[in-house]
From Swiss-Prot:
Organism: Saccharomyces kudriavzevii
Bilayer-crossing regions: none
Family to which the UniProt record says this protein belongs: Belongs to the AIM32 family.
CDD domains associated with the record: TRX_Fd_Sucrase
Lineage: Eukaryota, Fungi, Dikarya, Ascomycota, Saccharomycotina
Gene name tied to this protein: AIM32
Name of protein: Altered inheritance of mitochondria protein 32
């Protein structure tokens, strides 16, 4: 029988679901230690000389951004394409090629609006439509709207205004601040005012999400580990009803193995309620343990970076 050490989840009051935070002795067994050591050696053999090696002894940070919306620019092409390795610049804001140049434009229109994360995502299953390579539309999936918006480049400024409508109160620290390592988000919030709000309809697509950082040019550790974790999801048939994708940089590349889960709160009149759960140091051989415990309402302490509720 699996023994667990239960801790009080500090953020439980801020999550829609009820979770136990547990420590698994199994993760510290000799077998698991050997698996992790061998895996890290394998990854390090694949890394360019300019990348710091993957070190399983590095402490997992428990710092995550506090945010209201997550905007995902859907990469074009089928699931076998590799934009996460080829097309995603070290900093996506410097990318001049479509569709990724839309990220810097959207961010500039948002200005200093806090509480909105913007990433690229490369889908690994077929629950959500993908744009074609030469598509005239930009595909944005917005969480917690749980909607796919198809936007023309000329409408990006209005789309930014539309996105701001959901940020009534937000922390002063932006996601960019978080990525460069500034202090934790202060508790105080401030109101954001909007002008020229334009409505966009979007298509509602209600599914949980599993997102794995695979941003190779940001840090090759994530670029090498990301596809391995995706393969573990697929080979082990884990959370097969979830949207699955590789995502651009979300912090934590020092320890790598970063996975974000969005879990919808399936209750009456809770259409847009969900929990955002961030994990790091997730190795492919431990993914099954993580997913099975999560499905049973347990969060593994050794991999947990933090979480928030979203509405």
């Amino acid at each position: 029988m699996l023994r667990t050490t239960v801790r009080t989840l500090q953020q439980q009051a801020f999550l829609h679901h009820s979770f136990e935070r547990v420590s698994l002795p199994e993760l510290h067994s000799t077998i698991k230690d050997v698996q992790t050591t061998c895996y890290c050696q394998n990854i390090n053999a694949r890394l360019p000389s300019t990348t710091d090696p993957l070190d399983p002894q590095i402490r997992l940070s428990d710092r995550t951004p506090y945010y209201n919306k997550h905007v995902l620019l859907v990469s074009p092409g089928d699931k076998f394409a590799q934009p996460w390795k080829i097309a995603w610049n070290h900093n996506l804001d410097t990318n001049l090629n479509r569709p990724y140049n839309a990220i810097s434009k959207l961010r500039s229109y948002l200005g200093k609006s806090p509480g909105i994360l913007i990433n690229a995502v490369h889908l690994q299953n077929d629950f959500i439509p993908r744009p074609k390579e030469d598509d005239e539309w930009l595909f944005f999936f917005v969480i917690p709207d749980m909607k796919l918006y198809k936007i023309s480049e000329t409408d990006l400024e209005q789309f930014a205004s539309f996105l701001n409508e959901g940020v009534v109160q937000a922390p002063r620290l932006s996601f960019q601040d978080y990525l460069i390592g500034k202090a934790r988000v202060p508790q105080e919030t401030h109101k954001v005012h909007h002008k020229n709000l334009t409505k966009f309809q979007g298509d509602i697509l209600l599914r949980d999400w599993s997102l794995v950082c695979g941003h190779y040019k940001r840090d090759a550790k994530c670029g090498e580990m990301g596809p391995d974790i995706i393969a573990a999801f697929q080979d082990e048939k884990l959370l097969t009803d979830n949207n699955l994708g590789l995502i651009s940089h979300v912090g934590g590349h020092v320890f790598a193995g970063n996975v974000i889960f969005y879990k919808l709160f399936k209750a009456e009149n809770a259409l847009n309620k969900l929990d955002s759960l961030w994990f790091g140091k997730v190795y492919p051989h431990n993914l099954k343990l993580l997913c099975e415990n999560l499905e049973n309402g347990k969060i593994i302490d050794e991999m947990y970076r933090g979480g928030i509720s979203m509405n």
